[in-house]
């Protein structure tokens, strides 16, 4: 992964993480044929959810497919 010298604020990182989470939860619900709400509950109970909001991991920069593969 290419890194830049730009320093993102925590607010920007959070915005990216929330957007990524929404897209990933939607993909999870389609993949597993479950409701969005059920997918959200499952996802937020996972270790990946915690890692997503640990900005030091850099996962907030990735794609929904990448995150779903980690899940």
Which sequence ranges carry the predicted segments?
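C-terminal alpha-helical interaction appendages
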Residues: 1-71
């Amino acid at each position: 992964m290419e890194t830049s010298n730009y320093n993102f604020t925590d607010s920007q990182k959070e915005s990216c993480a929330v957007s990524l989470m929404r897209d990933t939860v939607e993909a999870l619900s389609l993949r597993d044929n479950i409701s969005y709400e059920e997918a959200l509950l499952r996802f937020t109970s996972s270790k990946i959810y915690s890692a997503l909001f640990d900005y030091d991991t850099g996962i907030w920069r990735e794609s929904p497919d990448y995150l779903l593969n980690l899940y």
